[in-house]
């Protein structure tokens, strides 16, 4: 397949999905966050999607690392616990979440897709472009963790989960840019759940951007896309057995292979830490058999000690022009009266011609706790009675506008 794009001003985005292995409750390896920090600092993703996140404290720790080591512009979506019925196992301690560079993406909304087991989490991101009002470009990022284990019963449970997603996506505009990242726990592209995702009759049809379809389980021909297990040694948590499965994926909608507004960068998809060495089959990634030129021993050590999965990475590109950062306009809006508030925050908008259609309130960890649509009125009374006491920042959706601080 040949993919070509015209030569315009281009912006590149780096994406990573990672199964965090019960973070932070899995403690067999001490100080695991240090190993994750090394991995994130090595790749420096613009969007970081995760599963097996146990709680909000783990999410906050990851956000702090991203802000300290990569960019203070990093934000996270609101952490939500699993809401699905969960009738087939106690998995309410395994959550999904997304982190993103707020100078490049604006979180427009987040939604939950319930299934019989675990939620799909849908995060609608908008490119922070100069023409985002007149011609917005949206990326729908969906993060998942399908039912694990082999056997026809588990295959059917995975299929039922994916069918719920298909139904949810049936209402999307057919030209939507959609990305599905997750631990699919599938053993072959012929498995019913995977076939459901790539069904050409669906409203949104997914593709494997690296085009490595096949029967992956214990098949050395696909060692380059294997993501589990990083380990053969027991006692570290998670699965052992060495590198012999492709469980982790980032799929894109078919239009992202060709559309110039937002598209997959050819040859950018990787199992991060996998040197595509056939000798690594069934070995742990620290083994000399797993050596190669792409990923050093130091990089592989960090991955080995943090999780039994390897992350999956890829890049997207756009031809739209992003807003230059930072060129702050501090007089665009202001807090009226004192910034010490109890129940109501009064805000005056001085300039609505700044590609802004919302205000966002963040806590000190950079998490969005409230969004406020902007109408025609220049004066807003914002109810903050539901917020906990503490320091907050309010910002226009246009990140060129300096955020304002208030205390509740």
PLM segments and residue spans:
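Bacterial Sec-dependent N-terminal signal peptides
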Residues: 1-12, 322-326, 367
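Generic marker of residues within folded, mature protein domains
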Residues: 5-8, 89, 113, 131, ...
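Short, solvent-exposed secondary-structure boundary motifs
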Residues: 293, 323-330
């Amino acid at each position: 397949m040949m993919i070509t794009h015209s030569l315009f001003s281009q912006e590149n985005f780096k994406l990573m999905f990672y199964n965090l292995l019960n973070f932070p409750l899995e403690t067999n390896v001490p100080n695991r966050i240090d190993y994750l920090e090394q991995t994130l600092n090595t790749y420096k993703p613009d969007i970081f999607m995760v599963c097996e996140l146990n709680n909000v404290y783990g999410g906050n720790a990851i956000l702090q690392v991203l802000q300290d080591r990569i960019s203070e512009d990093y934000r996270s979506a609101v952490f939500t616990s699993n809401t699905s019925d969960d009738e087939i196992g106690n998995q309410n301690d395994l959550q999904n979440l997304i982190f993103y560079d707020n100078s490049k993406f604006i979180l427009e909304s987040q939604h939950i897709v319930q299934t019989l087991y675990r939620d799909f989490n849908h995060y609608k991101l908008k490119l922070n472009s100069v023409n985002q009002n007149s011609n917005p470009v949206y990326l729908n990022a969906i993060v998942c963790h399908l039912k694990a284990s082999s056997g026809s019963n588990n295959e059917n449970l995975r299929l039922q989960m994916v069918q719920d997603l298909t139904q949810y996506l049936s209402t999307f505009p057919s030209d939507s840019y959609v990305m599905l990242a997750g631990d699919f726990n599938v053993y072959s592209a012929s498995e019913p759940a995977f076939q459901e995702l790539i069904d050409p009759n669906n409203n949104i049809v997914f593709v494997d951007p690296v085009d490595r379809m096949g029967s992956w389980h214990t098949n050395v021909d696909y060692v380059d896309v294997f993501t589990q297990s990083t380990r053969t040694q027991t006692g570290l948590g998670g699965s052992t057995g060495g590198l012999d499965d492709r469980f982790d994926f980032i799929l894109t909608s078919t239009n992202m292979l060709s559309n110039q507004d937002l598209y997959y960068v050819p040859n950018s998809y990787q199992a991060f830490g996998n040197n595509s060495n056939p000798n690594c089959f069934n070995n742990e990634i620290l083994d000399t058999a797993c050596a190669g030129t792409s990923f050093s021993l130091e990089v592989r050590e960090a991955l080995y000690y943090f999780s039994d999965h390897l992350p999956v990475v890829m890049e997207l590109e756009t031809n739209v022009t992003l807003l230059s950062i930072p060129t702050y306009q501090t007089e665009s809006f202001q807090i009226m009266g004192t910034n010490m508030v109890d129940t109501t925050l009064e805000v005056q908008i001085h300039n609505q011609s700044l590609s802004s259609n919302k205000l966002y309130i963040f806590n000190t960890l950079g998490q969005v706790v409230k969004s406020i649509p902007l109408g025609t009125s220049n004066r807003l009374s914002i109810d903050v009675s539901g917020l906990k006491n503490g320091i907050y920042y309010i910002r226009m959706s246009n990140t060129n506008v300096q955020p304002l601080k208030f205390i509740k």
